[in-house]
Amino acid sequence: MSTREGSLWGGRFADGPSDALAALSKSTHFDWVLAPYDIVASRAHTVILYRAGLLSEEQRDGLLAGLDSLAEDVADGSFTPLVTDEDVHAALERGLIDRVGPDLGGRLRAGRSRNDQVATLFRMWLRDAVRRVAAGALDVVGALVAQAAAHPEAIMPGKTHLQSAQPVLLAHHLLAHAHPLLRDVDRIVDFDKRAAVSPYGSGALAGSSLGLDPDAIAAELGFASAADNSIDATASRDFAAEAAFVFAMIGVDLSRLAEDVILWSSTEFGYVKLHDAWSTGSSIMPQKKNPDIAELARGKSGRLIGNLAGLLATLKAQPLAYNRDLQEDKEPVFDAVAQLELVLPAMAGLVGSLTFDVQRMAALAPAGYTLATDIAEWLVRQGVPFRSAHEAAGAAVRAAEQRAVGLDELTDDELAAISPALTPQVREVLTIEGSVSSRDARGGTAPARVVEQIDTVAATAARLRERLGGPA
């Protein structure tokens, strides 16, 4: 049997927990990241206890001095958990008692439970963590915008079903990866409204009878408000699940971008060249330059999805209020943040370092008869019903395939034989430049619209960064 050393409970137990139980319960190997937040919250709690008349001025000052000393030792690594410490809370209480004595150190626990304490600390940590993730996502957006701005007129094959579809601007395609990331960051901004609610003062589940002020400690800790329901405050982790979803969504969005880079850098596509600093080689094939960053980003998206699924499964069947299952809420979220903090800067660097072969992309843009839609829409503008126009454009493709030529290489007579409406003027849309320029509605791939889009995306990113409290 183990002892109860390092535990915050045990008065009604004759013996300590078994070694197996102690090992299962131990969480300092992952929750120690909450230690700085725990100390900040304990400082605020000390002030609230003093205001409630539960501490004298001398006791308040003694606790604050002890917490300051403990914070310094945690920061420089001279104070760390012992193997006997059950969790971050127990370790820090031990450290405080070592500095101020058991009588004074033991007073800090009045009016709070680990249930409201850890729920608060988790929110504090997560509110900071999502800002770091958002900043990383905006860096990827910045790299996409920079590449788009550097290639305002480059044309590439647009694809659906991975088949050649219509010509589009490279910048338009790159910005199509930026928009989802902007929405992810916007979700993070919106998430903070729900995360900025403090559970502190809720106790184990029923609130406190000691005259403490939850709103006051919420304000001290930078929360917008205190929780309205103490049971909900201690037992709910929807804020963690919401963050885990956004992290998984960022992973999915990065994975789609990564997939494009992987395809584009292949010999068969040949759209981009990878920079030496952002790619790897082979242990046996000297010629290889591998898109490892993109492949790892694609692989880690599955891990992020798994973290979300695991967290939701943990939450799905717990009765109110707190259950020890909730010890399992933090590792998936901590891991998701850690993975994104690795992937995001790597993806930003990868995107920013890509060298595009714009001549090859332009040469491939009309391949696969991607101008067929332009023929159909040109006929519609001449008054031909779209059904008939679609059939005529399809017939033009068939004729070009039979001769193994491009649509622009069909003769005037061949076009007229397909449809009398196909006059020589149709050739104005049988270029990739004419095709993209014609798509001038909002959201289209016309150069003028894409230039506007670059400005809009850059401005949106700057606005979101400002709302998150970071430099523009």
Curated annotation (Swiss-Prot):
GO terms for biological process: arginine biosynthetic process via ornithine; L-arginine biosynthetic process. InterPro entries: Arg_succ_lyase_C, Argininosuccinate_lyase, Fumarase/histidase_N, Fumarate_lyase_CS, Fumarate_lyase_fam, Fumarate_lyase_N, L-Aspartase-like. Keywords: Amino-acid biosynthesis, Arginine biosynthesis, Cytoplasm, Lyase. It is an enzyme of class 4 (lyase). GO terms for cellular component: cytosol. Its EC number is 4.3.2.1. It catalyses: 2-(N(omega)-L-arginino)succinate = fumarate + L-arginine. GO terms for molecular function: argininosuccinate lyase activity. The keyword Cytoplasm applies. Signal peptide: none annotated. It comes from the Bacteria. It is found in: Cytoplasm. Pathway: Amino-acid biosynthesis; L-arginine biosynthesis; L-arginine from L-ornithine and carbamoyl phosphate: step 3/3. The keyword Cytoplasm applies. Its main location: cytoplasm. Belongs to the lyase 1 family. Argininosuccinate lyase subfamily. PANTHER family: ARGININOSUCCINATE LYASE. This is Argininosuccinate lyase.
